[in-house]
């Protein structure tokens, strides 16, 4: 693979002082962000994938890089296997008295907290703020008098109701709650499905920025009050309007050092997940106005706009996607399908060695833990890998997988010393994986490519070189997973109950179509 032909997949910075939305065409769902000095930090939910809760950094709110993860693994053994739609939901990040705090809701376990003084370094192990089922989307807040609070929402799937917000006084060090707290807002009548609250204070008002109306069709609501427990005035401040951006909501208000205000939020586009947008914001009569073309204080999203004024020009940059496995650690674009083990892989001599892990042959591929995955980087693309198969053993199955609600994979299987091609297709909600044989494979090297067209149509190609790739198998339409977009990656398993062999990957490369 010629590295000079590899280009960034999605570039928001237009190089002329403007940016285009989305700033990240990648599934960084439920984003929250802060500014500390001249640095911006953003986090996102990641459900059952590990390492968990990605941390991104930017100097200008447009160009972002993944710099770390908040949790290396999920702190419960049952996440050693995929638990789709569970795990880490919408987190919040805050900076207080020299310490960075991240609150992480796990709807089946409780509200967790991690902290650090160095966001690039190691974060503390998660501890409970409150052990409780069904509480989600927590956000901490420290008032001028030193008292601390946590606002939360609720998951009806766990607790039986939603559309309510709750305030809890907490220890200033976030080590726990001080009392049971109380309900502070009921959105059933005017702000259904209100959730994802983020708490701020300005000019004597407490503000709760919160999405409402549902993930795909919803809007951004802001509540304000002179008392942290309410009563609250309410206002819808951002909606789709005449723009193509559905459900512009759930995110973070951030400012620049010179006082500009901006709002980061997601848009659910289906297969690619919840992608990230940046909107200009200003204040009128102590209400935020987000976006442009505001009517009665409610704006709509911009598609292109002048970049934030941050006092300097920074290089165009994007999160990593393609990987040539040249370092001594996996790139930060990669996550596993569940809690991972270091013995699953090695990086050696410019290759990724995937060691085939024992798997029950009845287990669907979507429920295999050692799938190494990354998020879709654009609406249309190809992804290509080169695998060396010499170290495969009988019972091994290895290849390229595209996960999602409906998933598919193109793999090489070794049985009785002979290798053959196989396509696996299924749906994580059903136990009906189809395994289709595609003929013998008589080479120790295989190039596998998958093309994604119109953010939906997935087609595989194989060859013994990059130049002789031929279509193989069936086109499979993509669908999103449980709260997540589609992810692509590599895997190696053994279905004969024995210690498996290995496959070596030279690269995993994305290219624009």
Regions found by a protein language model. Name each.
Residues 1-513:
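Carbohydrate-active catalytic/glycan-binding domains of CAZyme proteins
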